[in-house]
Amino acid sequence: MSLFDWFANREKAEPPVLQPQSPQEREVADGLWTKCPACGVLTYTKDLQGNWMVCVECGHHLRVDSDERIRQLIDAKTWQPINEHLRPTDPLKFKDRKSYKDRIRDTQKATDLTDAVQTGHGRLDGLPIALGVMDFRFMGGSMGSVVGEKLCRLIEYATLERLPVVIICASGGARMQEGMLSLMQMAKISGALQNHREQKLLYIPVLTHPTTGGVTASFAMLGDLILAEPKATIGFAGRRVIEQTLREKLPDDFQTSEYLLHHGFVDAIVPRPQLKRTLAQLISLHQPFYPILPPLNADSNQVNPELVLSHTALAVDNQISVNQDG
């Protein structure tokens, strides 16, 4: 066959038929890589998860769900969820483009969550804590009656067990579909936190992107120490609403964690990879010193009591020896 005939036959041949991808193959392909919304760089998803869902190129903190937050903060096999049975109802029979009841059902199916917060207790670097993690995927992390009840019960449990409380905040505010029932959660959670504080117990909220509305106006700003992630949007009313009300241009960094740190509304901005270690250090510093006393029949000349500080505390030595008098 001549070269001319070969090219002629090739042109007549039908192009190969591309087989469409199955939904499973397409899902795997879509999940292999994640595009940074800030710089646009594609990163292998497993590498991104290994870096706490922080872009390796620009340092942008990608939004993470509540399950990932728990995995990042709580020691393996120590997480014990509580009050998982609580589910929202539709007392107002609210309906916009779809009924609130249908919206709840669809969101529960999409996220595999009962509502916008997970609560429980576990160990953070060996330290027992009570933890609440809000999930923005569930109706924008909005605070309804179930979110308020779960957080309130978590704080009451922590008060009873004398545990520090950490709440990861990510919310658009109160849930309008529940009306006054959602707004009253602000006062209810604040009251539970006051009882917790009166017992000299530690509460640390961590403000992530975004933390706005009724959450900001209540428990997000009531911490003994308030931490925030870099470049998180934190505020009450929206930027456009404030500009239209005041009729003036706001600073470019307005309602960011850096702006709030500069004006004294948050105590520290902590990058996500350092969050667990920072929380462990702060909780350890708040823990009391526990004296280890010798047995009653021990030789007092050979045994020295020690004051033990948790291994994660900011101390030069992990154990501080105290010499006995005489």
Curated annotation (Swiss-Prot):
Quote the subcellular location field of this record.
Answer: Cytoplasm
User: Known EC number(s)?
Assistant: 2.1.3.15
Source organism? Synechocystis sp. (strain ATCC 27184 / PCC 6803 / Kazusa)
Q: Domain of life, per the record?
A: Bacteria
* Keyword entries, A-Z: ATP-binding, Cytoplasm, Fatty acid biosynthesis, Fatty acid metabolism, Lipid biosynthesis, Lipid metabolism, Metal-binding, Nucleotide-binding, Transferase, Zinc, Zinc-finger
Q: Which GO terms describe its molecular function?
A: acetyl-CoA carboxylase activity; ATP binding; carboxyl- or carbamoyltransferase activity; zinc ion binding
First and last residue of the signal peptide = none
Q: Does the keyword Heme apply?
A: no
Zinc finger residue extent: C4-type: 36-58
Give an example GO cellular component term for this record.
Answer: acetyl-CoA carboxylase complex
Name the record gives this protein: Acetyl-coenzyme A carboxylase carboxyl transferase subunit beta
Please name the NCBIfam families in this protein's record. Answer: accD
